[in-house]
Every structure is written in structure tokens, then in C-alpha cells.
A protein has these predicted regions:
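Short, contiguous alpha-helical
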Residues: 2-36, 73-123, 156-193
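Secretory/endomembrane lumenal or extracellular ectodomains immediately following the signal peptide
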Residues: 27, 32-48, 57
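A short small-residue
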Residues: 40-45, 120-128
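Short low-complexity stretches enriched in small and charged residues
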Residues: 43-47, 54-55, 103-105, 143-144
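Solvent-exposed interaction patches of small proteins and small membrane subunits
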Residues: 46-56, 109-111, 130-131, 135-138, ...
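Hydrophobic alpha-helical segments and helix-packing faces
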Residues: 51-54, 58, 81-85, 92, ...
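A glycine-rich, hydrophobic loop/mini-helix early in the fold
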Residues: 55-83
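Acidic/histidine-rich alpha-helical segments that form the ligand environment
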Residues: 57-61, 66-68, 123-161, 180
């Protein structure tokens, strides 16, 4: 017979039921509208961010995440179908990596198509809720800095280069950066960071 806490993850201290990724509604919303108007939830207005400002915005956002990972409830979901701050942090880390790779694709090819990425399948496959918050904190900081450095290297004449998603949505490097920065800002808002 086990007592409460015997099945807890030794690194996070969370019970398996607290971190099970199932039960999250898959994201199906097309968020490209955030490039045209301010987000009513997080307040981010992509139109107010010029391409060269993306790098500093990414760094400022990343600087706020370490405090989130130090919370005692970082692995707890606020509601059953809402990611925990830890899961959001894992997602943000992976989004940083994804958008840096998309940026490099646009910079190295003419109007490339981006591979689809299923964020929900990734969360389950990579067991976001079971990851070590201290490790994720370091990885998010490194991924955000790498992405910020890549956006910081974009030359003045390259901000209009394009790439596209499989659904046909076209991004310039500038709008890709704006969209990316909104995603990170929105998720920091989601976790009250």
C-alpha cells in the first residue's frame, strides 16, 4: 500500500494526475488576426513593434519566466483543461526554437513553406507536465536568447522576405517576429507572469 505522495515525481513533487497532458482542448484557432489589431486578452499590439524591436522584446519576455518556474505551484493546472505554468513554459521554449528555425528558413530560401507543428501532440509526446522546472527555465532562457540573437542579425533589407504556413498564411520576417512575440507575451499573460 502506498501513502499519498509515494507516486509523486521525485523532481517536481507532483502526482501523475496533476501533470497528465490529456484533457487539453487542441488549439485550432488561427491567431494571425493579432497582426491586424491588439489582442483583447493580453493587450499586445503587433502593429506597435517594428522588426528591429523583436529581439529586445523576446529578451524582456524571457527575463520574466524564471520567477514563474520558481513558484511552488508551477506544475499545477489552474483548471483541468488549462496548461500549468510549467507546461506553458515548455511550450514557450519550443516555440522559441520553432520560430528561430522558421526565421533561418526564410533567410536561407525564397518564400519557403513551414512544416506543420502540432503543439498539443508535442506537449503529450514530450511530457511537458513532468519536466523539471529548473531545467526548463534554463532551456527557455537559452532558446529565447538564441532566437533574439537571430532576429537581431536580420539586415534592414531582409525584413520583407517571406515564408508561408501550409494553410497559405504568408509571413514576412517582420510579421513572423511580431506573431512570435505575441505568442510569448500571451502565454506570459496566461500564467500571470
Amino acid at each position: 500500500m502506498t501513502s499519498p505522495g509515494d507516486s509523486a515525481d521525485p523532481q517536481t513533487g507532483f502526482e501523475p494526475d496533476d501533470i497528465e497532458p490529456e484533457g487539453i482542448e487542441p488549439e485550432s484557432k488561427d491567431w494571425t488576426w493579432v497582426l491586424q489589431k491588439a489582442c483583447p486578452d493580453c493587450g499586445f499590439d503587433a502593429r506597435s513593434v517594428a522588426g528591429p524591436q523583436v529581439a529586445s522584446g523576446l529578451r524582456a519576455n524571457a527575463a520574466r519566466w524564471p520567477a514563474v518556474f520558481k513558484r511552488p505551484d508551477v506544475g499545477a493546472r489552474p483548471r483541468p483543461r488549462v496548461w500549468s505554468p510549467l507546461e506553458y513554459g515548455c511550450h514557450v521554449r519550443d516555440v522559441c526554437r520553432l520560430f528561430e528555425s522558421r526565421l533561418e528558413l526564410i533567410r536561407s530560401q525564397v518564400d519557403p513553406s513551414f512544416e506543420n507543428w502540432d503543439q498539443d501532440a508535442t506537449a503529450i509526446a514530450d511530457a511537458y507536465g513532468a519536466q523539471d522546472p529548473a531545467v526548463v527555465s534554463r532551456e527557455l532562457s537559452a532558446a529565447a536568447e538564441s532566437a533574439a540573437a537571430a532576429f537581431g542579425e536580420v539586415g534592414d533589407g531582409d525584413w520583407a522576405r517571406t515564408g508561408r504556413r501550409s494553410n497559405g498564411s504568408v509571413f514576412t520576417i517582420e510579421t513572423l517576429g511580431q506573431y512570435f512575440l505575441h505568442d510569448l507575451t500571451h502565454h506570459l499573460h496566461d500564467v500571470h507572469g
